Design a protein with these regions (language model features):
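Aromatic/basic-lined ligand-recognition segments
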Residues: 180-184, 189-192, 200-201
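A contiguous strand-loop segment
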Residues: 23-120, 160, 359
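Structural recognition of the beta-strand scaffold that forms the well-ordered cores
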Residues: 37-39, 102-105, 167-169, 177, ...
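C-terminus-biased signal that marks the final domain/tail of proteins
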Residues: 22-37, 45, 51, 148, ...
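Bacterial N-terminal signal peptides
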Residues: 8-17
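Bacterial N-terminal signal peptides that target proteins for export
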Residues: 1-7
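Aromatic- and glycine-enriched pocket-lining scaffold segments that form the walls
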Residues: 142, 146-180
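Compact, glycine/acidic-enriched structural inserts
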Residues: 54-69, 112-152, 339-349
Length: 359
C-alpha cells in the first residue's frame, strides 16, 4: 500500500466534511442460549469505500504507517482473524479473531485527540486506522487490549483527518469503548452495548436521561378538560424519540430499539434480528448533503452492515449492492494454513432479483 493512498482517504474526509463520514451505528444483542452478537453499520456518503474482506493467518506480519513514512510499529499475528476493510486492505473497520475478540472503529470527529507523534518512538506508534488489525492480531480479550494500549502510541497520519473511537468486545460478554481525549486513552465499560459517533460516549449515556419519559407500547387514553385524548396509533409511548441521523439521535434510537427487542432463543435468529434493527439506521444518499451537492453515485450511504456472533466465532455482512447475508465461520478456517487474502465484499456489485413465474 502506498502512503499516498491513506493521505488521499484522509483528505477526502476533510474535504467533504465530518458530517458525511460519521453515521455509523452499533448495537449488541444476547440470545437466549447466551450468544453475544455485536452488529453495526458503516456509513460514508462521500464516495465508494471499495470495501474488502481480509483473511489473516497466524504469523502474518504487518507494519504501521507513520507521518512521512511506512516504518511504524511492526506486529505479527498471534491469532488469525477475519476483517472487513475500507479503502485499503490494511484499514480494517470491523473484525473478529479466532480467540473470540471483536474490534471495530467508529468515526469520532471534533472531540478526540491523539498523542502527538514522536519520530523517536515510531517503533511503538500505530496509525489509528490500523489499530483494529493490531488488536485482532495480538490480543485475546478486552483485558489484553487495555494492556496493549498502555504500551503503544496511537497516532494520526494526517492531523487534519478525523479521529476515531473503538468498540472492543470478547466472549466473556465484556465490552468497552476506547477514546483518546487530550492525548490520553480512556476506556469506558459499555454495558448498554450501543455506540455511534460524536460527542463522547459518556455524554451519549448522559443524554439518554433526556428521554426518561419514553417507554415501549402505547400511552393510555385519558380525559383533559372534557376532551378524550387517545393515541393515533401503536407505539405512542415512544412519541418524542429523535428521528434525525445525527449521532446523538441515532444513539438514543439504537438504545431503545435494542433494549425493547424481544430476545431470540438462538444465536442465528439473534443475528438476523440485529440486521432487522439496523435497517432503521440505513441512511439514503442525499440526506447528508445540500441539494445538488451529492458527491457520489452509490446506492446507499450505508455501505455495509455486519453482525458478529462472538460466542460462535462467526461474522456476517451484507452490502449496499447486495442485501443477501454472507457469513464467515472462523471455526472452519485453519489459520495455521490459510493464506492471506483480501477480496471485494461483493463478487458482483448488483442486487439479485428473483423473477417470479406464474404458470
Amino acid at each position: 500500500m502506498k502512503k499516498s493512498s491513506i493521505l488521499l482517504m484522509a483528505l477526502t474526509f476533510i474535504g467533504l466534511g465530518a458530517e458525511s463520514a460519521t453515521a455509523c451505528t452499533g448495537i449488541t444483542l444476547i440470545s437466549g442460549d447466551g450468544a453475544c452478537v455485536v452488529a453495526r453499520t458503516i456509513v460514508w456518503g462521500g464516495s465508494d469505500l471499495r470495501s474488502q474482506y481480509v483473511i489473516v493467518p497466524r504469523g502474518y506480519r504487518q507494519q504501521s504507517l507513520v507521518p512521512g513514512g511506512t516504518d511504524g510499529m511492526v506486529f505479527t499475528a498471534q491469532y488469525g482473524y477475519v476483517g472487513l476493510a475500507v479503502e485499503q486492505q490494511e484499514f480494517v473497520a470491523e473484525g473478529l479473531n479466532e480467540a473470540g475478540l471483536s474490534a471495530g472503529l467508529f468515526y469520532f470527529p471534533n472531540y478526540g485527540r491523539y498523542e502527538d507523534y514522536d519520530p523517536a518512538r515510531k517503533s511503538s506508534s500505530v496509525a489509528d486506522l490500523q489499530l483494529v488489525p493490531l488488536v485482532l492480531s495480538t490480543c485475546r480479550d478486552v483485558g489484553e487490549v487495555e494492556e496493549l494500549i498502555g504500551r503503544i502510541r496511537v497516532i494520526n497520519i494526517d492531523p487534519r483527518a478525523s479521529t476515531v473511537h473503538w468498540r472492543f468486545a470478547d466472549c466473556s460478554g465484556r465490552q468497552v469503548v476506547l477514546e483518546f481525549i487530550d492525548g490520553k486513552p480512556i476506556f469506558y465499560e459499555n454495558k448498554l452495548g450501543v455506540l455511534t459517533n460524536s460527542p463522547g460516549f459518556d455524554w451519549q449515556l448522559t443524554n439518554l436521561n433526556n428521554y426518561v419519559n419514553l417507554y415501549a407500547g402505547s400511552a393510555p387514553d385519558h380525559d383533559m378538560g372534557g376532551v378524550r385524548l387517545a393515541a393515533f396509533g401503536a407505539g405512542s409511548g415512544m412519541l418524542g424519540i429523535p428521528g434525525d441521523v445525527t449521532p446523538p439521535s441515532r444513539f438514543v434510537r439504537a438504545a431503545f430499539y435494542q433494549t425493547t427487542a424481544p430476545q431470540q432463543a438462538e444465536a442465528e435468529a439473534t443475528v438476523l434480528q440485529s440486521f432487522q434493527i439496523l435497517n432503521n439506521f440505513d441512511i439514503p444518499v442525499g440526506v447528508e448533503f445540500a441539494a445538488g451537492k451529492v458527491p457520489a453515485d452509490i446506492p446507499s450511504a450505508t455501505q455495509w452492515t455486519s453482525a458478529t456472533d462472538i460466542t460462535n466465532r462467526r461474522i456476517y455482512y451484507r452490502t449496499m449492492h447486495d442485501s443477501a447475508i454472507r457469513c464467515f465461520d472462523l471455526a472452519t478456517i485453519d489459520f495455521t494454513k490459510v493464506k492471506y487474502r483480501a477480496l471485494p465484499l461483493d463478487e458482483v456489485r448488483q442486487q439479485p432479483i428473483v423473477r417470479m413465474k406464474v404458470r
